[in-house]
Amino acid sequence: MNLQRFPRYPLTFGPTPIQPLARLSKHLGGKVHLYAKREDCNSGLAFGGNKTRKLEYLIPEALAQGCDTLVSIGGIQSNQTRQVAAVAAHLGMKCVLVQENWVNYSDAVYDRVGNIQMSRILGADVRLVPDGFDIGFRRSWEDALESVRAAGGKPYAIPAGCSDHPLGGLGFVGFAEEVRAQEAELGFKFDYVVVCSVTGSTQAGMVVGFAADGRADRVIGVDASAKPAQTREQITRIARQTAEKVGLERDIMRADVVLDERFAGPEYGLPNEGTLEAIRLCARTEGMLTDPVYEGKSMHGMIEMVRNGEFPEGSRVLYAHLGGVPALNGYSFIFRDG
């Protein structure tokens, strides 16, 4: 497997830290040892996050093609679009963002705070579109690309989550390689990795990266799309494409893609009581914030797996914190009392 042959444009600080979650582990009985890898602290570009790691492999292609405008898509409180806007500003490029109405939620300031506020401050051309949630290619995004061409620009297309893109899985192959190097320093290997999944390339890259040492099925995706069949298909497809691209010396099988469907409800972007309890518990035991759309759901999943005895006693579990905290501001009413 060879990731080094792909050009990478540095946008992150370097390897992200691994932090023991000692108080949360103790609160949950102390039989499972929890850790977090802090992708939410990976960059100085507008709070960073998992998409910034992915963009390191997309940006060299955009520059090589002479593109002048990054064009991406997400929901109103999209972390993806905020990170694309930050990278565009950092590189001196233009940025067009399609922000669809992916979440059935109304807060008085939902479309004026958090991620979308930062994207506007960063200078992006933010275009609100009423279309609902879907992780596939969108007509609104195609229209935005065409509008840039019609104005004489040269757009670079970045799909939702950087996912359905030939290079979208590479960043998290690198994540797995980074974890292996950190494990060598720590003196132990993690038994499981827990990660939130929606558009698929984060988990897909991890599956490929950890397949190299036989741990593909130890990556536990926690679905937050509430459309798990579509998410599972996309993870599997991206993983297979990425495996071929990096020269993994085995096929990706369906059994390699583990996706837990229990924690996504009631629907994309809306937390349930378990999500909210997990957000508060993590914050109050570790001082680590998670959001209601993504990380709160994967945190809920990990907590319940520990409570239910789904990890063998003594397991070391690595929680991949992908970012997303700026979206908390869009849910101010839910958290009005903390």
UniProtKB/Swiss-Prot annotation:
Its EC number is 3.5.99.7. CDD domains: ACCD. Gene3D superfamilies: 3.40.50.1100. It catalyses: 1-aminocyclopropane-1-carboxylate + H2O = 2-oxobutanoate + NH4(+). GO terms for molecular function: 1-aminocyclopropane-1-carboxylate deaminase activity; D-cysteine desulfhydrase activity; pyridoxal phosphate binding. Its cofactor is pyridoxal 5'-phosphate. It comes from the Bacteria. The active site is at 78 (nucleophile). The modification N6-(pyridoxal phosphate)lysine is found at residue 51. Keywords: Hydrolase, Pyridoxal phosphate. Belongs to the ACC deaminase/D-cysteine desulfhydrase family. Homotrimer. This is 1-aminocyclopropane-1-carboxylate deaminase. It comes from Pseudomonas sp. (strain ACP).
